[in-house]
């Protein structure tokens, strides 16, 4: 149970997570950089057209989340988590879980570091819900084991609301060979856009985000 570990990690390279406010600020810069690149292309393919059609809405959300993070308790929560040595797995998803008869084993701890512990849950929830729809029961089950503070709920809401999948797919395309566009890339972006609406509907039911 990562949430109950009382392990202190020795300071060193990659032993500490990133400040979430600065991380989102960097993500937003990357999104604008990708848009500038795509805009500059004289002939745009299907992926680029779809990206530009949805960029403004996605970026407004990303920018709004950054503004809220800057005035929220996220920065303080991060500093306190690092100071007290709160541990996260760093790659907590179903690939690293082994179902036993009466328990669950967690594997692959090479990304473990100090950070906001709720990040593990946010990462797992995002991965699981993208494949199984967004359902409130998983959050309720988590809080039965480990109730969240108001600051943690605020961070979880903002973290989950950020259009990270949109940025990830766009970034992957930006770094790829543009001469060989795969239909799979377009399909991934289409699914991401559809799931983003489902995600916001889910979040609006449990967090006062008003996105």
For the regions a protein language model found, what residue spans apply to each?
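Internal "kinase-insert"/substrate-recognition segments embedded within catalytic cores
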Residues: 1-11
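Active-site acidic catalytic loop and adjacent metal/ATP-binding pocket
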Residues: 2, 67-117
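Short, internal acidic amphipathic alpha-helical interface segments
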Residues: 9-12, 144-146
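ATP-dependent phospho-/nucleotidyl transfer catalytic cores
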Residues: 10-87
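Active-site activation/catalytic loop segments of kinase-like enzymes and analogous catalytic loops
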Residues: 114-149, 160-181
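ATP/Mg2+ or Mg2+-diphosphate-binding catalytic cores
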Residues: 167-211
């Amino acid at each position: 149970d990562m949430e109950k570990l009382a392990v202190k990690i020795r300071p060193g390279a990659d032993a500490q997570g990133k400040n979430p406010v600065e991380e989102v600020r960097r993500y937003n810069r990357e999104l604008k950089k990708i848009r500038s690149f795509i805009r500059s292309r004289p002939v745009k393919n299907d992926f680029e057209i779809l990206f530009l059609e949805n960029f403004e809405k996605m970026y407004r959300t990303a920018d709004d989340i950054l503004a809220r993070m800057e005035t929220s308790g996220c920065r303080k929560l991060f500093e306190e988590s690092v100071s007290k040595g709160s541990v996260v797995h760093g790659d907590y998803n179903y690939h690293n879980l082994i179902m036993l008869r009466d328990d669950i084993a967690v594997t692959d701890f090479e990304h473990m570091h100090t950070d906001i512990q709720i990040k593990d849950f946010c990462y797992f929830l995002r991965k699981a819900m993208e494949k199984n729809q967004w359902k409130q029961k998983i959050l309720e089950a988590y809080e039965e084991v480990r109730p969240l503070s108001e600051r943690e709920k605020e961070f979880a809401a903002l973290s989950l609301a950020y259009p990270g999948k949109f940025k990830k797919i766009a970034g992957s395309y930006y770094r790829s060979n543009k001469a060989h566009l795969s239909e799979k890339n377009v399909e991934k972006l289409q699914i991401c856009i559809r799931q983003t609406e489902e995600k916001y509907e889910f979040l609006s039911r449990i967090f006062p985000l008003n996105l």
